[in-house]
C-alpha cells in the first residue's frame, strides 16, 4: 500500500512539473532569457510584435512547419519572406543560436551570431549569395539598457559607418 502511494505521488509530481516546464527554446531565436510572453520591437518608425505561448513556442504566422530537436530548439522551418516561401535552418552551440541559413530559389542568406560574455549578440555576420555572387557585411551592437531579467531593451547597431537604434519592450509570463 505504501508503495502504491509513493508511485502515485511520483506520478503526480511528474505530471505537474511537466506542465510548468518550458518545452520550446524559441526565445533563443530572439536572444531573450526567461518565459517571454511577447516582445515589441521598434526601429525608426516601424514596429513588430513577436508572441510566445506559455510553453515557449514562438507564435508567428510567417513560420510554417517548424521542426524541433529533442531539446526544444527549432532546427528548421519554412518561412514567408517578402511574399516568397523559403527554407530556414538554425544551428545552436552551448545553448545559443550561432547560425541561421535562409534558402530561396535565387540564393542563400547566412547569418552567423557572435556573442559577448553576457550572452548578448555582439556581431551578426551576414553573407548573401545570389546567382553565385556573394556580399558580406557585419552588424555590430552596442547595448544601452537592460530590463530586470537581463534582456536588452535599447541598443545601437552599426554597419558601414551607419548607425540606427533598436528598442524593445518585453512582457513575461508569470
List each model region and its residues:
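Buried hydrophobic residues that stabilize the cores of well-folded domains
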Residues: 22-174
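Bacterial Sec-dependent N-terminal signal peptides
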Residues: 1-24
